[in-house]
Amino acid sequence: RTFVSPPGGLYFSVILRPHAKPEALMHLTAMAAVAAARAVFAVSGVYPDIKWTNDLVLGGKKLCGILTEIGIEAESREVDYAVVGIGINCARVDLPPEVSAMSASLEAFTGQKPDRARLAAALVRSLCELEQALFTEKDAWLREFAAHCITIGQDVKLVRGDDVTYAHADGIDEEAALLVPYPDGTKAAVASGEVSVRGMYGYA
């Protein structure tokens, strides 16, 4: 997959140091999506949709992508650090047609180019606030994630390598895993690291 990062965007990584076991951070990417959405709203007045689990969407097109990873201490098996990488399309720019068709920007959507320094500050502040509430207020921000997640209620393709399965996204569980009933009557909670979820009728 090719990533396009044109001038005028906001691209950065934040290192967090939560004291937790790795399994307690299954929902880290979802938390980062809520943090990014809150920051975009604070700067632009627009709260973007969330495409499960790591994209923000405006007008059915991708505004922001999020990648997370964790490092584990060898002896304690606890999390040593967590890295949240975020890219937000801020400025209206010329992109290759195949990218432009699925790419949104804050300037194109709102008519105003955002202050990237202000957006970065809002995002770091939001991430730090949610890191503090990672466990104590988990239900609240998971509800916020679900309320803005456009994947829920949609027919989707679950792509795992060369294996493609069609399903309906029913909701998320307490770890932000996607709940999907399969056509054969079975159900599963799909974790973000296991599969790629793609919309049936377009990007989102």
Regions found by a protein language model. Name each.
Residues 81-93:
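Active-site beta-strand/loop microenvironment that shapes enzyme catalytic pockets
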Residues 1-81, 102, 109-137:
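Contiguous, small/hydrophobic- and glycine-enriched helical/loop subdomains that border
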Residues 152-204:
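Conserved RNA-binding domains used in RNP assembly and mRNA/RNA metabolism
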Residues 91-101:
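Cytochrome P450 core scaffold surrounding the K-helix E-X-X-R motif
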Residues 60-65, 142, 153-155, 166:
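Conserved beta-strand residues within beta-sheet cores
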Residues 137-161:
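Short boundary/loop segments of OB/S1/cold-shock single-stranded nucleic-acid-binding domains
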Residues 19, 73, 90-93, 177:
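Short, acidic Gly/Pro/Ser/Thr-rich loop/turn segments
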